[in-house]
Swiss-Prot record:
One of its GO terms (molecular function) is protein-(glutamine-N5) methyltransferase activity. This is MTRF1L release factor glutamine methyltransferase. Belongs to the protein N5-glutamine methyltransferase family. N5-glutamine methyltransferase responsible for the methylation of the glutamine residue in the universally conserved GGQ motif of the mitochondrial translation release factors MTRF1, MTRF1L, MRPL58/ICT1 and MTRFR. Disulfide bonds: none annotated. GO terms for cellular component: mitochondrion. It comes from Homo sapiens (Human). Transmembrane segments: none annotated. It is an enzyme of class 2 (transferase).
Length: 338
């Protein structure tokens, strides 16, 4: 998981922004010549690292290592048996590495190239344009698990929360929670059909489909929420679109050209979906239920001010947590009224 974290933050330009202003163009790519004399995994990693570096591809060595390892049937280059490092590859393997590397030269994210990625120890299928789960979102999951553990200890019984995830994408958050909370149930919603399909696929892949209800739903449509199969909820969890609209053009090529912009663009102040979630929460949550959100570092103050202007919601911002880069990234909001 380290690759995407380093790649993402290396591409950031300015505090709290996911992206880069580096220019690029598909038309500049040309097919690579035959790899004469290159036959081993180590040689191929070295070759493609050099090619990527010359073309300004972020995380050049890590990208080449992941691609070569994938073709050889491993998740990481370091996990390959040392004997495979110097063993000659077949012509089919060489061709596959060339084809995958050409996609990286077009700035396709490694996660889409490989077609899978690990999140919280789960191997998830990745398909463009469904949003790729970031490493900091694993910290959001860990915070939710801590809260469930604390509540379970307080009541003296195992945690069996009913959880709603808004904007499930690949299902990373929902499936991680289900895998670590065996008594839990999850409702996962998303307005994008591609995300719903991928969450279904990942749930079946992990054999968690019996405890998750996946719904194609636009959360901005209030009438849709009257048809939820379970409720009320103990927890609402979301990594919503939170990029400020004016920052969308500054996103890195890997993000801007491959991921669904609707999963990123949060409107003028990045708050459009966040405020929809908060406005609906009192109708969906149990008494003392909680909301956990991943947000832009500029959002904690904006959310706090917005909640103060809506006392009728009976929602309080009780905690803000920083991500691994020290930025205020996660919010815990609790219902505290009727």
């Amino acid at each position: 998981m380290e690759l995407w974290g380093r790649m993402l933050w290396a591409l950031l330009s300015g505090p709290g922004r996911r992206g880069s202003t580096r220019g690029w163009a598909f038309s500049s790519w040309q097919p690579q010549p035959p790899l004469a004399g290159l036959s081993s995994a180590i040689e191929l990693v070295s070759h493609w690292t050099g090619v990527f570096e010359k073309r300004g591809i972020p995380e050049a060595r890590e990208s080449s290592e992941y691609i070569v390892a994938h073709v050889l049937g491993a998740k990481t280059f370091q996990s390959l048996r040392p004997a495979l490092w110097t063993q000659p590859l077949t012509s089919q393997q060489l061709q596959c590495i060339r084809e995958l590397s050409s996609r990286r030269l077009q700035r396709m994210p490694v996660q889409y190239i490989l077609g899978e990625w690990d999140f919280q120890g789960l191997s998830l299928r990745m398909v463009p344009p469904v949003f790729i789960p970031r490493p900091e979102t694993e910290e959001l999951v860990e915070w939710v698990l801590e809260e469930v553990a604390q509540r379970s200890h307080a009541v003296g019984s195992p945690g069996s929360p009913l959880i709603l995830e808004v904007g499930c994408g690949s299902g990373a958050i929902s499936l991680s929670l289900l895998s670590q909370l065996p008594q839990s149930r999850v409702i996962a919603v998303d307005k994008r059909e591609a995300a719903i399909s991928l969450t279904h696929e990942n749930a079946q892949r992990l054999r968690l489909q019996d405890r998750i209800w996946i719904i194609h739903l636009d959360m901005t449509s209030e009438r849709s929420w009257t048809h939820l199969p379970w409720g009320p909820m103990d927890l609402i969890v979301s990594n919503p679109p939170y990029v400020f609209h004016q920052d969308m053009e500054q996103l890195a090529p890997e993000i801007r050209s491959y991921e669904d912009p609707a999963a990123l663009d949060g409107g003028e102040e990045g708050m459009d979906i966040i405020t929809h979630i908060l406005a609906l929460a009192p109708r969906l949550l149990k008494d003392s239920g909680s909301i956990f959100l991943e947000v832009d570092p500029r959002h904690p103050e904006l959310v706090s001010s917005w909640l103060q202007s809506r006392p009728d919601l009976y929602l309080n911002l009780v905690a803000v947590r920083r991500d691994f880069c020290g930025r205020p990234r996660f919010l815990h909001i609790r219902r505290s009224g009727p």
